[in-house]
Amino acid sequence: MIKQLVKKKITKHIEDTSKRKLSIQFSLDGFSFCTSNASDEVAEFSSYVFEKSVNSPELILKKLQEIFKTEKSLQNDFESVTVIHQNNLSTLVPNQYFKEDSIASYLKYSVKTIATDLIVFDDLEFMDTKNVYIPYVNINNFLFQNFGEFEFKHHSSILLEKLITKSDDSLKFYINISQSTFDIVVTKDSKLLFYNIFDYQTKEDFIYYILFTL
């Protein structure tokens, strides 16, 4: 079962429909998207939450296929499409230690990988770091069939850029909460001091990881 948690249409008429932009984010918990115009004004935002977190990219794809069949807003043409993969299959590697031909080795200590996994990276220029991660290839393929070429990123790349580029001299502790995971980001002096993503099921899990980080 898929519950549509939020569907918000904002009265921003897009005169030139060829200039529509689409942003999509998905995880094991749900799916959301927003459309905007050439000035990046949001025209529509929708969020769907899965009744239970799914445990594989194959099950996410089935959920997305259901949504795409009924969501008319996703059946339009778009000038650009951005896809955000939200998962815990990532790690940060400073540029001075990064070698693209060794990319698989950076995940082996924190993520269970197999030989056929596609491993990619986002270039985080604002902190001289690469964000190495595993995207869900089957979902990328499905979206390519629907929209053609698009840009994709890991959710933590966007989160870190937003928080670090606006940080100041003070110590900041941020929590970004999803249905079954949450990110903790600690910054100071426009630098990253700590980042991790945690799974949780109970409020005790949530409190434990926060206290552990503090």
For each of these PLM feature ranges, what is it?
Residues S36, A43-K52, K62-L163:
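Active-site neighborhood for divalent-cation/phosphate handling
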Residues S53-Q65, K203-L214:
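Helical "lid/coupling" subdomains associated with nucleotide-phosphate turnover
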Residues I2, D123-T213:
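Small-residue (GG/TT-enriched) beta-loop-alpha framework at ligand/catalytic clefts
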Residues K3-K8, K21, K52-P57, I103-S105, ...:
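N-terminal start-of-chain detector that recognizes signal peptides
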Residues I2-A43, T165-K191:
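Gly/Thr-rich phosphate-binding beta-strand-loop-beta motif of the actin/hexokinase/Hsp70
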Residues L28-S56, K191-E204:
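Short glycine-rich, Thr/Ser-proximal phosphate-binding strand/loop in the N-terminal lobe
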Residues M1-L28, E44-L59, E71-Q75, I84-S90:
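Intrinsically disordered, low-complexity acidic/Q/S/K-rich activation/interaction tracts characteristic
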Residues K8, T35, N76-Q86, F194-I197, ...:
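C-terminal region/appendage detector
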